[in-house]
Structure formats: structure tokens, C-alpha cells
Amino acid sequence: MSYIPLPNPLPVSLTGQTLGTGDLTEDAWGVQKVSLPYSLFHGMFTFDIPAKMWFMYEGGTQVYTSTNIVSTDGAAVLTTSAGKTALILESRLCPPYQPNRGVLFSTAVWCPSKTATGCVREWGVQTSGSGVFFRLKSDGLLYAVRRSVGVEVAEEVITTTGVSGFDVQKGNIYDIQYQWRGGGNYKFFINNVLVHTMSLLGTLTALSMSNPALPIVFKASTADAGVANCAIHIGCADITSENGSITEEQWGSAYAENVATNGADKPVLVLHNPLLIGAMVNTRTAHLRTSSFNNTKKCTFKIWRTRSAGDITGETLVAGYGGKYSHIQSDSTNMNAGAVRATAVTVANLEFIYAVTVEAAVRSAQDFPVSHLELNLVRGDYIVVTNDSVNGVSDVVFGWGEEV
């Protein structure tokens, strides 16, 4: 029997090894560059489509239950039908681009009936403004697609002959790797084989993609309402930052003071992360970090979340200090004179998050630390704080870290 003794392990030499491609394989001090993956977002569908992690859309309308977007035997499955010819599964989070770090999107997919009439399937990262993704069209061919500033700037056929036995109708793993920095290259992989490169260095006079902080998106759509087999099956999905780390956040906060409340579930503060910034989808996520509550009476504050403005009555939402520091909006007249406080909320429609009980005139604080347990505010989300005091006066402060 042979073994490797701990005091004298086998020597390891990197001399003569191929250590990366190109000439930038060492840092400024001559230390070999090493790529360590750091997952920014991942999704699995073992039991269901987790609503806290994914949005579902049918015909452009967000839905909260669906018979066309389901979990089947651990896979997410999107299947069109008459009247539901455009389906989207989209991650809640838009993982931020980490400067000077590579981005890697990864998934596993299979697409039955690859030439189904009028059927188009897509998987990758995208919004209406930016994106890079695979597209399977009804000609049975795969395409590499890139979008910037709302315009599809590239749709290029992918040659798959180098992938042994490739069949898009069977389960394969797909990766998209890109450098960005505003002008880097994009590489498409199938089963770990490089099948297509968008070689852009030294060719552009604009950004290769106007926004690199994008959600994972899977789509199935058909121009023929009678086609019922336009489907995409998904194993899991991930966005990784190569050599990445915990994302830096920019501090923001909002407060409401001297808010008279009397009765159950009266609104004290509403926060809103707008769906759009200008005409583009807002991909900045805010993570709630700190909060404090006070009332002249012993009472309970409750924190809720919703995506429907119809659940809130009477409010006018304005970005604090005129949007100088953040696009996050609130109904606090203390933050902006143009705001109007909400007068009522329909709590039956809201997602309950947390409750804090305070003694009369004794401030209580609740922190939400940086961890894998996140309370986030993504594009289109509302956070509502309510109070149940009898003739009380409330003060609330919320602080958040925003991915900019």
C-alpha cells in the first residue's frame, strides 16, 4: 500500500502549464490569477415554482398561479395553450454586475418538438432593454442573441456540430459567459463545449449591452394559438460572478414621523421600488437592513409586501429628496413635500413579512443583517408598514442597502 504523507506531500509545479488564455494571466505582482465562482442567484424547482424567487407572466401580465408554468418531477415547465401563447418565467432578483468580474449564466434545458409551428423558446438573461440569451426558433436552429438599449443588435446562428450527439430536444447544459466592462466578448457553451463567440473587442462605438445586471428569463411563445406543444423544460439556473464576492450596497433610508393612527392596520409608511427608471426596466434591488418603530401607545407594527398599487389607497409616492440619491419612493411627507400618505391598505391581499410590538413611547428596533435570509425590494415591489394603535402617534424609520 502506498500513501502520501502529510509532512511531505507531492510537490506541485505550475512551470510549463497553460494557465488561462491571453497574456493577462498574472496580477500586477506576478501572482497567478485564479477564478473562483461566487453564486449571486440560483433557482431550483423541486416542489414548485417558488414565488419568493420567481415571477410568472402570461401574455405580458404577471400571474401568481398558473397551470401553464408549473413544476413537474422537479423541472420547471412552460407550455403554451390557446389563449396563453406567451409565457415567461423570470427571476425576482437581477444580480448586479461586479466590476472587472466575469459573469456566467448556467442552466439545463430541453425543448420538445423543436420545429413546432411558430414556436420560439429563449433562455438566458434579459429585459426588454438588454439581454444575452439562447433562442430556439421553429426552424429547429439555435441562435445567440444580444440586445442593448431596447434594440436586438445581434441574432447569430449557433453551429452545434462540435457537440457530440447534440439534440436540443434532450437535456443539455447551457452556459453564457461574458466579460462586459461595457465592451467585452460573449461566449456560448453547450455541454461545456464553446459553440459560439460574439467577438466584440475593438469593434463597437457603443456599449455591447446597456445594462449587465439582468434577471434570468425563460420564455415560450407561439404565433399559432392552436399549437399546444410549444414547451421548455428547465432543470436549474444560476448566475455566478467569477472571482466575485458579496455585493457592495449604497445606503438609503426613509422615515415617517407624527403619523396619527387609530384602528387596525392603518398605514404609516409605504416604500416602492419603481418598475421602470425612465423607459427602462429597473434592475436595482434594495435589501432592507434596519428598522425602528415608536408609538405613543402600546401597539403592534406590521410589515407587508405587495406588487399591486391597487392594494394601497390615497398615496402619492415620491423619491426622497427629489430622487437625488435614490429612485426608491415613499409616501412620507417628511421626506418630500409632494408626497401624500396612504389612507388605507387591503391587508388581505398583502404578503405578511413581520410584526413588532412596542411599549408606549419606547422605541423598538429590528435589523435584517446581510445574510442568505434577505428581505428585498425589487422592481415593482411595495413595502407597507401598518399600525393598530388606538389614537396613537407613530414614527417609523427604514434603512436599506441598494445595489447600484
Predicted regions and their residues:
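Short, low-complexity N-terminal tether/leader segments at secretion or assembly junctions of large
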Residues: M1-T18
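Extended, solvent-exposed segments with strong compositional bias
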Residues: G323-L373
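Glycine-aromatic-enriched beta-strand/loop faces of beta-sandwich-type recognition domains
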Residues: G118-I173, G338-E359
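Cysteine-clustered segments with highest specificity for TGF-beta superfamily mature ligands
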Residues: L10-V12, F218, E359-S389
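Ligand-recognition surfaces built from glycine- and aromatic
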Residues: G20-F41, F45, S199-G278, N282, ...
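Secretory/extracellular carbohydrate-interaction modules
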Residues: L78-V149, A260, L276-T283, H287-V318
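Localized edge beta-strand/strand-to-loop motifs within extracellular or lumenal beta-rich domains
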Residues: Q169-K187
